[in-house]
Amino acid sequence: MAIDPHKDVDGFHPTNFGKMALDMESFIPATPYGIMELLRRYQIDISGKHAVVIGRSHIVGRPMSILLSRKSSPGNATVTLTHSRTKNLTALTKEADIVVSALGVPNFLKEDMVKEGAIIIDVGITRVPDASHPKGYIITGDVDYEHVKEKASFITPVPGGVGPMTIAMLLQNTYLAYSRHADI
């Protein structure tokens, strides 16, 4: 790895990933960190809830599963980490109290895939061609937002949901790196 773990504000260095997994002080990847901050600030209790994370990337899926299951607040969820080879994904998401989708497939998560009152976190962000839009495209998430929002107790929009929180937590990590270096 080229970057020093003490300067790894993205939280991707294996040292930081390992420390995060062991619940030690480390830089946490910005997107999962932002999602946890959303849950904390909106006072969403996830303790004892079943969370399904769709996507097993090192950037979102795996760190998200670790943070959701941590013995902390928010945390203490029972987590199922799914991926492209998961069988019966719909059966899992229909039983989930929390669904975090980090797949990158526009409008993948449909209304019939979630239960009433579920907490839906949409991490996906895809440019979808749209000739009627001035830019020629629209930004779409993994969740069929307009239909799923009717069933969800909490849902993040795309754009404007997880993305701004990712930026905020990246800045938080940057400040933390500076304060450690400056001994503030």
Give, region by region, the residue ranges found by the protein language model.
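Glycine-rich phosphate/diphosphate-binding loop of Rossmann-like nucleotide-binding domains
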Residues: 18, 24-119, 128, 136-138, ...
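Rossmann-fold NAD(P)-binding glycine/threonine-rich loop
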Residues: 1-18, 121-183
